[in-house]
Amino acid sequence: MKAVVVGSGGWGTALSMVLCDNGHDVTLWSHDPAKAAEMAKTRENSKLKGVRLPDSLKISGDLDCLKGAELVISATPSFAVRETGKKIAPYLTPETVLVSVSKGIERDTNLRMSQILAEVTGNICKVAALSGPSHAEEVSIRMPTGCVSACPDLKVARLVQDAFMNDYFRVYTSEDIVGVELSAAMKNVVALACGVCDGMGYQDNTKALLMTRAMAELTRLGEKLGGTRQTFGGLAGMGDLIVTCTSMHSRNRRAGILIGQGKSAQEAMTEVGAVVEGYYAAESIYQLSQREGVEMPLCRSVYEVLYHGVAVQDVVSSLMRRAKKDELTETTWL
């Protein structure tokens, strides 16, 4: 199968390596021709230091590499999905399968990544999402990893499963692309919050409370938007939440630690030196919760800290002093 991975960051590069290991004809596209040339020469991506790129992997800065591609992976940062989607649209056909692996919600429109791709490509082809607890640093050295391929058309989800699955990269399928993509976006917000806890010196009890109650908020919003409850307890939901909230591979968590230590959100993102998706997702998730009338006190608190400069200690006190309630009812997780 001819596959093109659009976006040469760590995640796009790691996925291109998986596809190469599976014997596909793979090209990794970079928006920066100079970077593409450097990677082709050194067989290394600076985002994955010490990892040699497969000799079979072609690397290009020319969009013409998309001609004839059967599988196209959209692996750009969430803020670049719309612009890049417009650029690749002319190369897609009804037979192409387009897979979003970006994690986020678009600012202002509050669209999921697959929705943006479907819109800017004129729904010319099927769009799936691939997501789960999967740090690029670990996938690139072939650590056992599991993800979920999601598409309302299960045949498409299974095609993606077949393309990626091997003895170190296990892929499950799902029809719930809403739940999978929403989980991918919100876990970055929660990882930021967990990092703040670390930066302030809070310990395991606090982070367990945060992660569990955040999952309740995700489930409430996700079901309201059409997601399936079971998705949020699976790899794309709880699995990705755990790995992002507990690992120093997570730039969202690293940014949160700096905020907890007293840095501003902008200072923290500058110091991390990479895209902190949770910063942008926090605003979008807050807007979605307001639009849908879903109570999400944790996500609202993260939004207030990031965008309005509210003191972390003040939001912690406010959250802990909320009105008493039962944890569960017959119909919902409160």
Where are these regions (language model features)?
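NAD(P)+-binding Rossmann beta1-loop-alpha1 motif at the extreme N-terminus of oxidoreductases
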Residues: 1-52, 58-61
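Ligand/cofactor pocket segment of small-molecule handling proteins
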Residues: 205-208, 212
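NAD(P)-dependent Rossmann-like dehydrogenase/reductase catalytic/cofactor-binding core
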Residues: 187, 194-198, 223-233, 237-334
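Rossmann-like NAD(P)(H) cofactor-binding subdomain of soluble oxidoreductases
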Residues: 53, 59-142, 160
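Rossmann-fold dinucleotide-binding core
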Residues: 105-203
